[in-house]
Amino acid sequence: MTKTLSCGAVIYRKIQGRILFLILKHTNGNHWSLAKGHTEFGESEIQTAVREIDEETGLRVKFKPGFREAIRYSPSPGVEKTVVFFLAKARGKKLTLQRSEISNGIWVELEDSLKLISHKDTAEVLRRAQAYLIQE
């Protein structure tokens, strides 16, 4: 069994009491998800998340301590993929999308993001992020 690890983040911002999440439309598979990507040799999970967020969105973020969610699935026979998501507040709103991988990026509230997110495990990570932010 081949194991792969990707890392990324639930990126959010707060506007007038509303929590908005950034969801991205990935060109590979044409699906909506979060900023994430494969770890490179020697990188920590957080380092991978920072690099992927920068590459895919151009955003600088501040990570919220204490939030780490992992999902596991098999994208193909003989492959087990783990994706680790952190929670990160955007320091700005201007997106510079990596057009080779990302065709669109939008800021939406939880309900709208759940209608677009393609994988139910990722939708559950968004729900947990919202609950975490509300508890603050």
What do these predicted regions represent?
Residues 1-20:
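Conserved N-terminal beta-strand and adjoining loop/helix that marks the start
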